[in-house]
């Protein structure tokens, strides 16, 4: 008994007949049609033209993915059998090393930002080629391209569930993409407009109902995802706002600017809570310290009073080649660490709370021990400027991006960096 429905059998028979006609095997095709009582005539625009070949290629591709999945499953089973407790400890303290596992190539211009999906093995990359590309970091394969922006894309961020992806661009717009509609032809997401210059960063706030954006128009804006309305404009910076990030509970919003300052705001009122001055050049990047790092920071600064309030400490990186750690509530500079030889473009706290990682245009990633401020390791993994870092979800893969136009993926933990082309002007 055939496992195919009548319609499936008819499609299969016609596809075979079309293939035979295309190979100039007319007599065999006619004989087949007669034997199967098949009423079919080959036509140039027939929907069956090339269908058999496409199905064959799809089967081969699926077989390859199945084999890769089986191999990964076998490797994971062996790793689990080798000692899960020991591996968990190793994962907590893992630090990035060269070389990367994958080189992902497809973008036609410098890559500007990368973001990990919170659940699936997906990596989004934004580029000056006006597109966002989605990759499977586990296999190193390209998934799809998102088109909709008309100029350089500078920021990309997933919400906490991975249901939406936000992007921002020099075309003055922010776009919110429903991940369930990626495959729909012509889909270009919802557009949020209001900024008057390049939008440099976009971030979902905790709860995923609001988005914060930073712009060269010197403002930070808060947007409702559902309505696409701008509900608040925060002003105060005197120059380009390079980045904005929320605290883990969403009660604070940090920003850094070309005016050489970093600031912390109340996102519900737009009131500035603290200003941080001390850098001698543009402040490129800001990051809130996670609760896991508080003990190490207190040891670093000699602080006795303990706090568990989210957003108690921040780190900033500047074109003055230094990283500074600050007490948010007092505004006190706790420590300055130096070692990079060029602009600092990326900062990320290690999930264990023991380290802070920085990326620089000097082509290195440095690992700093938070409790002492000492540089523990220098990763010389790139040949061009490194301009951002992102740490992905637990039990994930490492992704770094090196340009021209190539992201790298490694193992076994998620960290992402991107590098601008050597000849690309530094804004």
From Swiss-Prot:
GO terms for biological process: cell division; establishment of mitotic spindle orientation; microtubule sliding. SUPFAM superfamilies: Lissencephaly-1 protein (Lis-1, PAF-AH alpha) N-terminal domain (SSF109925), WD40 repeat-like (SSF50978). The lineage of its organism: Eukaryota, Fungi, Dikarya, Basidiomycota, Agaricomycotina. The gene is PAC1-2. WD repeats lie at residues 106-147, 149-187, 194-233, 236-275, 278-336, 339-378, 381-420. Positively regulates the activity of the minus-end directed microtubule motor protein dynein. May enhance dynein-mediated microtubule sliding by targeting dynein to the microtubule plus end. Required for nuclear migration during vegetative growth as well as development. Required for retrograde early endosome (EE) transport from the hyphal tip. Required for localization of dynein to the mitotic spindle poles. Recruits additional proteins to the dynein complex at SPBs. This is Nuclear distribution protein PAC1-2. One of its GO terms (molecular function) is dynein complex binding. Dimerization mediated by the LisH domain may be required to activate dynein. One of its GO terms (cellular component) is cytoplasm. Pfam families: LisH_PAC1, WD40. Residues 8-40 form the LisH domain.
């Amino acid at each position: 008994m055939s496992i195919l429905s009548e319609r499936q059998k008819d499609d299969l028979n016609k596809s075979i007949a079309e293939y035979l006609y295309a190979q100039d095997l007319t007599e065999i095709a006619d004989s087949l049609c007669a034997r199967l009582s098949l009423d079919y005539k080959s036509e140039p625009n027939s929907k069956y033209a090339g269908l058999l070949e496409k199905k064959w290629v799809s089967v081969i591709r699926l077989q390859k993915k199945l084999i890769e999945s089986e191999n990964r499953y076998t490797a994971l089973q062996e790793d689990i059998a080798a000692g899960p407790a020991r591996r968990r400890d190793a994962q907590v303290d893992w630090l990035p090393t060269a070389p990367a596992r994958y080189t992902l190539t497809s973008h036609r211009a410098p890559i500007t930002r990368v973001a990990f999906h919170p659940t699936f093995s997906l990596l989004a990359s934004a580029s000056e080629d006006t597109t966002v590309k989605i990759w499977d970091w586990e296999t190193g394969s390209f998934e799809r391209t998102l088109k909709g922006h008309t100029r350089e894309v500078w920021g990309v961020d997933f919400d906490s569930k991975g249901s939406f992806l936000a992007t921002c661009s020099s075309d003055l717009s922010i776009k919110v993409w429903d991940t369930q509609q990626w495959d729909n032809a012509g889909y270009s997401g919802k557009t949020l407009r209001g900024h008057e210059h390049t939008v440099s960063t976009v971030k979902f706030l905790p709860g995923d109902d609001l988005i914060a954006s930073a712009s060269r128009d010197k403002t930070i804006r808060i947007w409702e995802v559902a309505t696409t309305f701008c509900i608040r404009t925060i002003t105060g910076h005197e120059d380009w706002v390079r980045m904005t990030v929320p605290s883990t509970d969403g009660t604070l919003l940090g920003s850094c600017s070309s005016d050489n300052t970093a600031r912390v705001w109340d996102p519900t009122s737009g009131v500035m809570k603290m200003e941080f001055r001390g850098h001698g050049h543009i402040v490129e990047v800001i990051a809130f310290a996670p609760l896991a790092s508080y003990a190490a920071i207190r040891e670093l600064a000699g602080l006795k009073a303990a706090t568990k309030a989210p957003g108690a400490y921040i780190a900033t990186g500047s074109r003055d080649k230094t990283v500074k750690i600050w007490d948010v509530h007092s505004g006190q500079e706790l420590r300055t660490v130096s070692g990079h030889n060029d602009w600092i473009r990326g900062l990320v706290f290690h999930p264990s709370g023991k380290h802070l990682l920085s990326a620089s245009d000097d082509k290195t990633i440095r690992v700093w021990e938070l409790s002492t401020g000492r540089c523990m390791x220098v990763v010389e993994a790139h040949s061009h400027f490194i301009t951002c870092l992102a740490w992905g979800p637990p039990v994930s893969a490492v992704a770094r991006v090196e340009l021209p136009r190539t992201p790298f993926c490694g193992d076994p933990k998620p960290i992402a960096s991107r590098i601008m082309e050597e000849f690309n002007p530094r804004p």
